[in-house]
Structure formats: structure tokens, C-alpha cells
Amino acid sequence: MRHSNSGRKFSRTPAHRKAMLHNLAKALLIHGKIRTTEIKAKELRRVVEPLITLAKRNDLHARRQAYRVLNDHALVKRLFDEIGPVFAGVPGGYTRILKMAMPRKGDNAPMAIIELSRSSETAAAEAPKAAKAAPVKEAKPAAEEAPAKPKRTRKPKADEADAEAAKEEN
């Protein structure tokens, strides 16, 4: 009986399953969003959301716990310095799973995109602000334009050069 056994097995050994989920978590935190199967995305959410909660705590013990999963000091630093503060006032739900219309070619597995919810919203909100803040460059007068470069001509091939030399000799 499967009483109080949570989590999916994925037809893998426990060590393989743990390594797969940790690698998916690393990829998600590095890239912000990844494409995987729906079931892996749902399991990945169970790994990533506690990591972001640890990043909101921002103490030494939380960093060590995050390092146990990520096994990369640079990624732990990024998690605590960049990703954690973005979700500071959010009580949970740090990831979003978007189901894709097309299944995976080959085995017809249902695919999904899992992404960090705030990172895509903040990037979308900052893009118009950055566009407004960028100064508009003034157009240069036509007199200051650079002169047009002469068109490049093609060099004759060795066979054509021999044929032309033979014509000149005759």
C-alpha cells in the first residue's frame, strides 16, 4: 500500500531521481524558465519553492541548506542576492507551470514550461521603463554621412586567369 508515500518515482532509482530534480532546479534558477514534461515540472516545483523560501530567510544556515541541493556556490549566491529579494513580500507560489499545446515528438509526452513567476513579470515591467528612460538620439544631417564605399569586384579564378592569359598571348 502507498499510504503517505509522496512524490513520483519516474522509473528511476532514488539517487537518479534526486540528481535529476537537483539538476532541473539548477537549470530553472539559472535560466528563469525551462521546458520539461508536465510531471517533472510539478515535481520540480516541490524542490524549487522551498529553495526560494530559504533565500528569503537569508542566513548562513539557509545558505548551507540551499547548497546541499544546488551544490554550486555561485548559484547559491545568485539565489540569495538576486532571486530571494524579488520574492520578499510573496508568501508562496514562486513558480508558474504553463502547459504546452504540442506534446514531445517521439513519445508524445505532455510538455510544459516552468518559470519563476516574478522574474518574468518584473522583466516585462522593466522593459517599458527602460525604453522610456533611454534618450532619443538626434538624426545627423545628410552632409555628415560617410561616403559610399566602392562595390567589391570578384577575383577571377585560376582557370579563368589562364584562359585570359592565353587569349592575350595569341
Swiss-Prot record:
PROSITE patterns: RIBOSOMAL_L17. One of its GO terms (biological process) is translation. Residues 135-148, 156-170 have a biased composition (Basic and acidic residues). GO terms for cellular component: cytosolic large ribosomal subunit. InterPro entries: Ribosomal_bL17 (IPR000456), Ribosomal_bL17_CS (IPR047859), Ribosomal_bL17_sf (IPR036373). The keyword Transferase does not apply. It comes from the Bacteria. The keyword Ribosomal protein applies. Residues 124-134 have a biased composition (Low complexity). GO terms for molecular function: structural constituent of ribosome. Pfam families: Ribosomal_L17 (PF01196). Belongs to the bacterial ribosomal protein bL17 family. Part of the 50S ribosomal subunit. Contacts protein L32. This is Large ribosomal subunit protein bL17.
